């Protein structure tokens, strides 16, 4: 009798994806982040579901309902802390996953890469609408400021903003629809993840060398199931440490005050994972220009496959491009820091230099480095 694992219509899909999947024998720990993101998504959906059972999407009771979850619901404080800090873990894994893709040339699997960029945008949208739900000061003013950016769109901008708000300001209608979006988007993300995996399994995984690994493949189970399990445990350790010892470390103190539309927050500051994009937005004094730069900072990922000039796929054997990659990493860390600072000198000029450097590195310097490395590899005699 043939193994059920290989014949059952449903089980064989799981088998081809997680058990008998041929995987390169040399993929490093940088390839763990895909499965870690899957784990993060499951954690977020489960904790979110339990929070939604007790949360009320109403301007009068939203803040109190979150306090009620933390005080009166069994382990409500833990569920909320896991959900809030789980978002930070999600983005940490996302950034490392994207960074891995850029470093090792995984973006040359164009369909997988493009779906990945769409996933990144969807997760960012989910996190933004989710941040509004506790209805604290930063929730309210964050929602007001970020949705207001759409008013920079010529002609239809103001109409669009009021349509999203459901009125003439961020109010009950806005909160209700943001809760609806926050509930539905993770399921859309799950569907996109399946498409992402579908395209990935058409080509198979890339590997650190960037060379075709077909001649040396090993089964996913037990090798990478064990390796992923170690990654899960380490991630869970970090998440639990964060949620249990310093749950509010990454949050904003302003969000402990209920939203007051009459009192303006002294500084509008998104969560840490949006600060790099926020810094790019603020570095341009023109509203429409800032919005376009904000969009470009993420959408630039879509053109990275077109900017690949090297004859080699990975950066593993390309020291000049490696140097530029780590400069880009330092640049993004600088932007993240600047995004959290007030709009005054010297932060303004640092932000502007870092923003220009970000686009310059990706669009000009890295493609040029690829061409130069090609030239250096050619025999000169």
Curated annotation (Swiss-Prot):
Q: What is this protein called?
A: Cytochrome b
Q: Which organism is it from?
A: Osphranter rufus (Red kangaroo)
Leader sequence range is: none
Alphabetically sorted, this entry's keywords are: Electron transport, Heme, Iron, Membrane, Metal-binding, Mitochondrion, Mitochondrion inner membrane, Respiratory chain, Transmembrane, Transmembrane helix, Transport, Ubiquinone
Q: Gene Ontology cellular component?
A: mitochondrial inner membrane; respiratory chain complex III
Q: Which GO terms describe its biological process?
A: mitochondrial electron transport, ubiquinol to cytochrome c
Top-level taxon: Eukaryota
Q: Listed GO molecular functions?
A: metal ion binding; ubiquinol-cytochrome-c reductase activity
Kindly give any further remark recorded in the entry.
Heme 1 (or BL or b562) is low-potential and absorbs at about 562 nm, and heme 2 (or BH or b566) is high-potential and absorbs at about 566 nm.
Q: What residue intervals traverse the membrane?
A: 33-53, 77-98, 113-133, 178-198, 226-246, 288-308, 320-340, 347-367
List residues binding heme b b562. Answer: 83, 182
- Topological type in the membrane: Multi-pass membrane protein
Similarity comment text for this entry: Belongs to the cytochrome b family.
Q: PANTHER family of this UniProt entry?
A: CYTOCHROME B
User: What does the function comment of this entry state?
Assistant: Component of the ubiquinol-cytochrome c reductase complex (complex III or cytochrome b-c1 complex) that is part of the mitochondrial respiratory chain. The b-c1 complex mediates electron transfer from ubiquinol to cytochrome c. Contributes to the generation of a proton gradient across the mitochondrial membrane that is then used for ATP synthesis.
Record-listed heme b b566 binding positions: 97, 196
Cofactor dependency:
heme b
Q: How does it assemble?
A: The cytochrome bc1 complex contains 11 subunits: 3 respiratory subunits (MT-CYB, CYC1 and UQCRFS1), 2 core proteins (UQCRC1 and UQCRC2) and 6 low-molecular weight proteins (UQCRH/QCR6, UQCRB/QCR7, UQCRQ/QCR8, UQCR10/QCR9, UQCR11/QCR10 and a cleavage product of UQCRFS1). This cytochrome bc1 complex then forms a dimer.
Q: What Pfam family does this protein match (any one)? A: Cytochrome_B
Record gene name: MT-CYB
Note on how the cofactor is bound: Binds 2 heme b groups non-covalently.
Location of the protein in the cell: Mitochondrion inner membrane
